[in-house]
Amino acid sequence: MRYILNNNVEGTSALLGSTVATAFLQPFDFLKIRLQGSGFASGGDLNKFKRVGVIDTCKNVLKNEGIKQFWRGSSPTIVASGIAWGTYMHFYEAYKNILKSKYNVTQLNTFDHFICAVGASATQVFITNPIFLIKTRMQLQTPGSANYYTGIFDGIKKTVKVEGFKGLYKGVIPSLWLTFHGGIQMSSYEHIKFYFSSNSGKSLDSLNASEIFIASSISKFLASTILYPFQVVKTRLQDERNIPNQNNVRVYNGTKDVIFKILKNEGIIGFYRGLVPNTLKVIPNTSITLLLYEEIKKSFNYIINE
């Protein structure tokens, strides 16, 4: 047990913290995905563009699909988030240790943290993209949708059958752009933590819950706001409805086409669809995840060193 924990403290701590946080905040993730994927009417008719907001989306879901729909895709969301955070933090700490050993230092600077975070994010993308793709499609589908997914494995099976193995990696390019999200978030998080530590005289491991909450909230807000448009582009590419419709016309043909059509039909604001529910979800989610991560990591380290 101690051997396993000693080699997976960060990954296991992040996985557990993310699982708890994601389960409580699932409805906000559902709304974010619905709003990011909105813009064109069902069937991909470019002449039926319409704008929808948070309130209208909530009303439509409650009226036509029921309250349970807010938790549709919760299983893949929880699984995806847990694996993503666990994988990310495991490799983030691993890359940090590599640089510390290379430079023979105990504390890395902000740029080093940025590089480690981007590297960890890229590694995590290739491992988890198929799961996030199925999660996204399950949240965008409605009862009666073509190729309706009943679960993660059913979604993977149908995706491979219809689109081939490469279909599981739709949206991977904008996902790789989003590796800078992890870079901005974690370098900011580490910098703010170091600021609190320097001004209070406490060690980084001794920071209290409020300091961790502030550091995680600010860092997540910065990263999310700056790079949010890439999330919208990724969601549009992954949306199952963007496969040829009944008229055999594709809504989007690649990343450049998505960007062009969003600008043409929705304007700049189209790149920020779902930002409000996303902010309401990701900031508390990240704060809770990192709070639990830090506390669980302390507990695991105590067990290992006991």
UniProtKB/Swiss-Prot annotation:
Solcar repeats lie at residues 5-98, 108-195, 207-299. Disulfide bonds: none annotated. One of its GO terms (molecular function) is FAD transmembrane transporter activity. It comes from Dictyostelium discoideum. It is found in: Mitochondrion inner membrane. This is Mitochondrial substrate carrier family protein M. Residues 32-72, 135-163, 233-278 are mitochondrial matrix. One of its GO terms (cellular component) is mitochondrion. The gene is mcfM. Belongs to the mitochondrial carrier (TC 2.A.29) family. It is a multi-pass membrane protein. GO terms for biological process: transmembrane transport. The keyword Repeat applies. Residues 1-10, 90-113, 185-211, 297-306 are mitochondrial intermembrane.
